[in-house]
Amino acid sequence: MQLQSPFGDGISCECLNIRVLGIPNETKHQWIFVPRDLIKIKIYSLLQICKAENCSAVACRGCNLCILAVQGNIEISEEPQKLFQEENVKVYIYDSAISLSSVRASFPISELGIRMDIIKARAEPREDEIRASFSSLVNKEIKRTVEELLLSKRSTNRLSLLAFMRNQQLNYEAYETKLLEDASTIEKSLEKEVKTIYDSNIASPKESSDAIDADHAMIDESRSTQRRKSKPKKHVAFTDEYQVAFSDKPGKYFNQPMQYSKQFKLDNPDYEASSDSLNDIENLSTLTFRSDEELEFDFDTNNINNNKSGDSLEMSTTIPSDEENEDFTSKVDAMEIHSGSLPLNIDSSPIFTNHSPSSSLSSESSFEASPSSFVDRKNRWIQMLKKADEHSRSIQARSMGYVLSDDLDNSKAFRPYKQSFLAQGWKSLN
């Protein structure tokens, strides 16, 4: 049943302690459904319930009036809000119920909304009951207010927390960006420093090698000058065939002596080989030396002839004319033995001695060596070549980073393989 009356109309007891709002006078002697919130009880301690058949009568001890009955059995509990369990309560209105509007218009009402004169005349309530009733009402309002405050505070705290977290995130992103910039700056500076050190390490050996090459060039130039001023060499002591390196410039050596190699063309881009020089090199490549037995035999024969006839001693070794001697001497001065990275000049060997410039061996003084000395000199020369070859191979092996047994035994400046590779080998890879 819908309530057509406006809010404020209803029924009440005589002291206004129990009220049912929104109920007009025409609803008496009827069972109607009333929302639980419209049943108001001011002083809960003045409430009295009388149980009947299938219903419970609600009365007020202040005015001793029973104005309504509730369907079902109800119990007085400590909390007034638990008096009615259902949202819509089915009630029956008695004739003793007074219209609420008439009571408010006829009698004075206290600040509590009840008629205190009737309550004092009929039944004086105890102070503790009144205090408990009011405390329940106040506590309800306080609880509602506190919940509202907590909700508002919680929302405020949530917003402030979000703002704080957003600020922290911005600070962290700024710190991370600055840290990355510092790291990139340090990395660039380190790369620049490493590149500078690497360039200086490459440049310093180059400068030292240039200085060494300049010193070698000066030494070779002085040696070539000495060779031009010295007496011509006309005798070769060893008898095996050797390849002789030819070079117009002293101090240059080639792996293929009888040809103009690629290295020679790179070192001498302006040099153009003439047909005469090529012919001379071809003629020089066919130069051979006689064996020990032939030299010995010629030497003995000449000695015998000298004893018999007393003529000048002449060896059977073919000696060219004066013009050919000068040409051959100039070429011999330019010839050098190439062995790895350690060059050896022919004139540095003890095989060549200062002889007289005569074109023939006219006396014993011009040929001081015995036949056995030729063999000794040849053996010494071969040993020198072997040592030079071993020396060049050891230098090449050290440059590649290997550690030789001689370095372990004799070298004081021993460096392990890893250190040698880091010092020399890795530069060649780059």
From Swiss-Prot:
In the record, which residues are listed under signal peptide? none
- List locations, semicolon-separated: Cytoplasm
Q: Which UniProt keywords apply?
A: Cell cycle, Cytoplasm, Meiosis, Phosphoprotein, Sporulation
Q: Record keywords: Cytoplasm included?
A: yes
Does the record carry Methyltransferase as a key word?
no
For the modification Phosphoserine, which residues carry it?
S204, S399
Q: Which residues form a coiled coil?
A: none
A GO cellular component entry from the record = cytosol
Q: This protein's superkingdom?
A: Eukaryota
GO BP terms in the entry: meiotic cell cycle; sporulation resulting in formation of a cellular spore; TORC1 signaling
Function, as annotated, reads: Component of TORC1, which regulates multiple cellular processes to control cell growth in response to environmental signals. Tor2 is essential for growth. Nutrient limitation and environmental stress signals cause inactivation of TORC1. Active TORC1 positively controls cell growth and ribosome biogenesis by regulating ribosomal protein gene expression. TORC1 negatively controls G1 cell-cycle arrest, sexual development and amino acid uptake.
UniProt subunit comment: The target of rapamycin complex 1 (TORC1) is composed of at least mip1, pop3/wat1, tco89, toc1 and tor2.
Q: What is this protein called?
A: Target of rapamycin complex 1 subunit toc1
**Source species of the chain:** Schizosaccharomyces pombe (strain 972 / ATCC 24843) (Fission yeast)
